């Protein structure tokens, strides 16, 4: 698959990234996308938790997908071995149906991660930002922890994600 695109980046380089900094990066990307397009975008968010929480979740996903993996696409078979979290990002309709019943990461978050996870929607609600929680949103890179997001054009919905990012430490 070939793609051509323009991109920009904004990163906070810090040893301790707090919730405010994470939300600042999200709001910067959201505002930039809306300014560039001239209209609202759809913001989808998820929370991947710490590395420890994510490892527990990966184990649960492996157990869930094990009975299904033989009937899944080749990408999902590879992802099952390498990183089962990425199966949630599969675009094959039959595999998406299986993913609907997969465990949710929020059930595998540590107590500390649970607190941070609960603060994100509250903070966005407090400032009036519209968003959708998408349990299947995992992003393509393994270094993300905590909040992840993708932005979609609300008018030209065939584009797929027009932006994305998240927290990594």
Language model features: what each stretch is:
Residues 1-169:
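TRNA-recognition modules of translation machinery and tRNA-sensing kinases, especially anticodon-binding
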